[in-house]
Amino acid sequence: MKVLILVLLGVVILQAAPIRKLEDLLPTRYPPEHELVYWCTYANQCDFCWECVHGICRNRIQADWPVIHQNDWIINCTVSRWNGICSYYEGPRNHTDHQMDCANPTSHTYPHREYMKIYERDDL
């Protein structure tokens, strides 16, 4: 439910200030800090969305997400924006490229709990 509210809030923010007004973004593995909410909503497996310390990872944007063990679910991503088209590339392992209208974004990733390796306090 909280994720849905976050997504709806993101859509409202995009409607108020469309991302098209932003400059083009050359392909990067490190999007600007002020754009992380946008990118991490639609590309939530990307490593720049997670902060990992000693193998335990927390989502940098969505505080209600579970704490997870660092694992292959978190992937290296490259994001870019050109002429109103936002892209993120899941690679190099997946070699998957997603493109979407920046003003009407769609998520191509979503949490598969069985792959996330959720951290439990009993794991200590």
Curated annotation (Swiss-Prot):
Keyword terms, alphabetized: Glycoprotein, Signal
Residues bearing carbohydrate: 76, 94
Stored Pfam families: v110
UniProt cross-references to InterPro entries, sorted A to Z: ASFV_fam_110 (IPR004848)
Signal peptide range: 1-16
Domain of life, source organism: Viruses
Record family assignment: Belongs to the asfivirus MGF 110 family.
Functional summary from the UniProt entry: Plays a role in virus cell tropism, and may be required for efficient virus replication in macrophages.
Identification of the protein by name: Protein MGF 110-8L
Record lineage: Viruses, Varidnaviria, Bamfordvirae, Nucleocytoviricota, Pokkesviricetes
